[in-house]
Structures are given as structure tokens and as C-alpha cells.
């Protein structure tokens, strides 16, 4: 009797154990779909990005017109460009839902998987930021200037560091060239770290909605979850194509249709929607260094999640107090996103400060306390 090649061949065996015969909990819901959707987004972004890079020119005198050339003259260039731009938005939608699922169901207790995932978030944010600079429109240029300038808040080495990143005394040709290099390089580092993320996940197996050990009831990934994921994939692609074909500029900034001009500042400098919550936290602190630290901590706080878990139960499924706090956190993030896109004036300033305080209070203080109270209620 001949043995199955997919179970014996060194390469096929890895794929088989990761995507075909992988034992999966039988009760995982559609919230466990986002991992495969993120993998799809990454592949899609890499393919469209490579095709864009074939026609893009990373010189300040050519960058803006090369993007216009892609949109007008390249076969399906408009489609590739719009899919890449809106694909980034979709990528972040999936990331935030994936992280939200992880927090709700206590997936962060798989520390290695969680920490590599948080590192992936940082890398993805860096990639999106340098990518946003490439079209060399007004918002590209000023976002690059403002965000890189934040590093000057670092004591002693700040100014030197900023000039080193700029490659000169202002955002210029050298900056654009290196940002293009980083934007091309980082997705491949993300791919490598994604492999590590999966490696750690498959060491422990997936969590499930109950948070209990599911070893007694596992089913193979294929055909059950490969088909279940296919539904999510079709819905995601339908959403992406609707966005790309009917509302291609809905999530973009109109200022970016104006070529970069160092002599004219846009009335409201703001990043893409997926960074607005962090931008609101940055702006809510009147001190430059304090703002930068708060901005960093708003993401770094995810690394602390496993240490802040006080409950005897893993998921939030059966913990009403923590559930209220979780949904308050989601509402708070939506408020921060709205505030990040508003001008710095009352009442937006004070709302932003209150929302920022609430964000850190929920994650660092209220959730751990709620966990302890729930333990007391159980005992």
C-alpha cells in the first residue's frame, strides 16, 4: 500500500499539517475567519503592490505624475491602484476585528502567538504609513513631515534621529526613496513573521468561544473550515470590489489629489481613518513627548494584556461586567476615531482627552478589577 504523498513529502507535509489535517475545535465561530482573511489581504496587497512598483517612480519630481500615469495609461492601472489603496483599509478592518476577537475570547493567553501578532500590527502600521507617503500628494508630504517630526521629542538624540530618517534637513527626495524601499521590504518581513505567528498558534492549537480545552472534540481544518472560510473570503472580496469600483475615493483624503507643496500647509493634517484613534490620543496630550509616549502606549498596551488578565475564566463570554467594559472600549475607540478627524478646538479637544483617559483606564485598571470582582462573585 503506497503512503499518501501529502503526508510524506517534506514540503507537502508542512502545508498538510497547517491547512488540511490541522485539528481544529469544532465550535469555532465566524470570528475565527479573520486569520485566513488577513492572509488573503496580505497576498492581494503584495501582488497589486508589485504591479504598482513596476510603473511607479520614487523621485519627488515624478512620483505624483507616475501615480497619475498608472491610473490613466496603464492597462487596468486604475483598478490595481484602487484595489491596493482600499485593500489597505480592508486589511486594517480585518486586523482590528481579529484583535477584538482575541481580547473578547482571551486568545492573548497564548502569549507567543499574541506577541508576534502585536509585532505584526506594528509592522503593518509602519508599512501603511510609508506607503501613504509614496503618491507625494499634499497629505502624503505633510503626514510624513508631522509624524517623523514626532521623533524629535526623544531627549538628546531626537533632532539627529529625525534628520537621519529624512536624509537631510527636511522631507525631500532622499526621504521618498527610502520610504519606497521600506514599503517594498516590510511586507516580506510581515510574511516571515506571519509564518512564526502560525507556528506558535499550531503549537497550542486554536482557542474557542468557550475558552475551555477542546482536545476532546477536534475536526480536520479541511473540508470543514476551508469551506467556512471561503464564505468569509467571498464576502470580503465582494465588499472590496464594491468599494473599489463604486466608491474608490470614499476613504481617501481630497488633499492628496494636490501635488505636495512644502510652502502650503493643508488646513487639517490627518492620517488615514485606521490611524485616527491613535492620532486622537497623540493630540489629547498638550506635551510633545507625553503625546508620543501615549501614542506608543496605545498599541504597546496590547503586550500587557496577558499580564493584566485576572479572571479565572478565559473568555468574556460568561463575564457580564467585563463584557460591558469591552463594548465600552469599542465605543470609546469609535469616539477616538471620530475625534482624530476633527480640528483641534473645543469641544473636540476635551472629548478627545476624556476618551483617551477612558481608553487606558478600561484596559489597565477597570478590566483587571472587573476580573477580580467576577472571581469573588463565583467563589
From Swiss-Prot:
Transmembrane portions of the chain: 34-54, 78-99, 114-134, 179-199, 227-247, 289-309, 321-341, 348-368
Keyword Ribosomal protein among UniProt keywords: no
Bilayer topology: Multi-pass membrane protein
Cofactor note: Binds 2 heme b groups non-covalently.
Main location: mitochondrion
GO cellular component: mitochondrial inner membrane; respiratory chain complex III
Cross-referenced InterPro entries: Cyt_b/b6_C, Cyt_b/b6_C_sf, Cyt_b/b6_N, Cytb/b6-like_sf, Cytochrome_b, Cytochrome_b_C_euk/bac, Cytochrome_b_N_euk/bac, Di-haem_cyt_TM
Keyword Metal-binding found: yes
Domain of life: Eukaryota
Keywords, alphabetical: Electron transport, Heme, Iron, Membrane, Metal-binding, Mitochondrion, Mitochondrion inner membrane, Respiratory chain, Transmembrane, Transmembrane helix, Transport, Ubiquinone
Cellular localization per UniProt: Mitochondrion inner membrane
Biological process, per Gene Ontology: mitochondrial electron transport, ubiquinol to cytochrome c
GO MF annotation list: metal ion binding; ubiquinol-cytochrome-c reductase activity
Coiled coil: none
Family affiliation: Belongs to the cytochrome b family.
Additional record remark: Heme 1 (or BL or b562) is low-potential and absorbs at about 562 nm, and heme 2 (or BH or b566) is high-potential and absorbs at about 566 nm.
Annotated function: Component of the ubiquinol-cytochrome c reductase complex (complex III or cytochrome b-c1 complex) that is part of the mitochondrial respiratory chain. The b-c1 complex mediates electron transfer from ubiquinol to cytochrome c. Contributes to the generation of a proton gradient across the mitochondrial membrane that is then used for ATP synthesis.
Assembly with partners or alone: The cytochrome bc1 complex contains 3 respiratory subunits (MT-CYB, CYC1 and UQCRFS1), 2 core proteins (UQCRC1 and UQCRC2) and probably 6 low-molecular weight proteins.
Name this polypeptide is given: Cytochrome b
Species: Terrapene nelsoni (Spotted box turtle)
Gene: MT-CYB
